[in-house]
Amino acid sequence: MGDVHESISEQMADWMAAQPMFFVGSAPLSGDGRVNISPKGMAGTFAVLGPRRVAYLDYTGSGAETIAHLRENGRIVVMFCAFEGAPNIVRLHGRGRIVLPGDESFDQLRASFPKERTLGQRSIIDVDVQRISDSCGYAVPLMDFTADRVVLDRSAERRDEEYFERYGQEQNATSIDGLPALPPR
């Protein structure tokens, strides 16, 4: 049986920080729109900003579903699972907002993340957490963490800002359902 919490405790924040990956879920308002779940990783890209506020650093990817869904309706869930140690699942349901490079609060939020690479960062997803819950996770498999993948970092090293700007406008301007994602710059 799961528990609902009033706030993110220090113990919960430490546990989330120790997980090598998390998942982000979002959906459009349309009943025939596609639900999206994205795995997220890379050390230093998630931050607990307060007892009911979290954020993650969003790098350029093949799609922009979460951004499109947040622009349309703001709904988001962030989920962590224990793949090592005691079983546990934490879900953070809330309302998210997209903070783009150049936005007034971007630099202040960016300082919350230890991840140093800035090339290819597309946004920060800032979440006002409305429901915090945990559950057993007894069916989540045990897996050994080997290392963070470095493919995205190495790929970014071969690019420049113009590449990411062009890619964002050509590949991340809309969701797979045609919702607006990254705004023109």
Residue ranges of model-derived segments:
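Binding-site signature for planar aromatic cofactors or substrates
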Residues: 1-185
